[in-house]
């Protein structure tokens, strides 16, 4: 029996793909299919969650010289 799922095609570089896979490992069910090294098919209702998690992860790696510690 076939099951259809709505998905969104994501094109990204391999480093961002690795981050999305990391996000999927912590909250599974986001990635429907890994197509190749630069394309993923993710659930359509998880797009905003993936964007916010990517922004959170990437903001950790930005150096701001004006930010007080």
From Swiss-Prot:
GO terms (BP aspect): nucleotide-excision repair, preincision complex assembly; transcription by RNA polymerase II; transcription initiation at RNA polymerase II promoter
GO cellular component assignments: cytosol; transcription factor TFIIH core complex; transcription factor TFIIH holo complex
UniProt superkingdom: Eukaryota
Main location: nucleus
Protein keywords: DNA damage, DNA repair, Nucleus, Transcription, Transcription regulation
Subcellular location(s) of the protein: Nucleus
InterPro entries for the chain: TFB5-like_sf, TFIIH_TTDA/Tfb5
Family: Belongs to the TFB5 family.
Role this protein plays: Component of the general transcription and DNA repair factor IIH (TFIIH) core complex, which is involved in general and transcription-coupled nucleotide excision repair (NER) of damaged DNA and, when complexed to TFIIK, in RNA transcription by RNA polymerase II. In NER, TFIIH acts by opening DNA around the lesion to allow the excision of the damaged oligonucleotide and its replacement by a new DNA fragment. In transcription, TFIIH has an essential role in transcription initiation.
Subunit-structure text: Component of the 7-subunit TFIIH core complex composed of XPB/SSL2, XPD/RAD3, SSL1, TFB1, TFB2, TFB4 and TFB5, which is active in NER. The core complex associates with the 3-subunit CTD-kinase module TFIIK composed of CCL1, KIN28 and TFB3 to form the 10-subunit holoenzyme (holo-TFIIH) active in transcription.
Protein name as annotated: General transcription and DNA repair factor IIH subunit TFB5
Organism listed in the record: Candida albicans (strain SC5314 / ATCC MYA-2876)
């Amino acid at each position: 029996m076939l099951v259809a799922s709505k998905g969104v095609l994501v094109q990204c570089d391999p480093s961002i793909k690795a981050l999305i896979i990391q996000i999927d490992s912590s909250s599974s069910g986001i990635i429907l299919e890994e197509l190749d090294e630069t394309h993923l098919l993710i659930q359509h209702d998880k797009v905003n969650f993936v964007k916010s998690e990517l922004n959170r992860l990437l903001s950790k790696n930005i150096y701001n010289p004006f930010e007080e510690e």
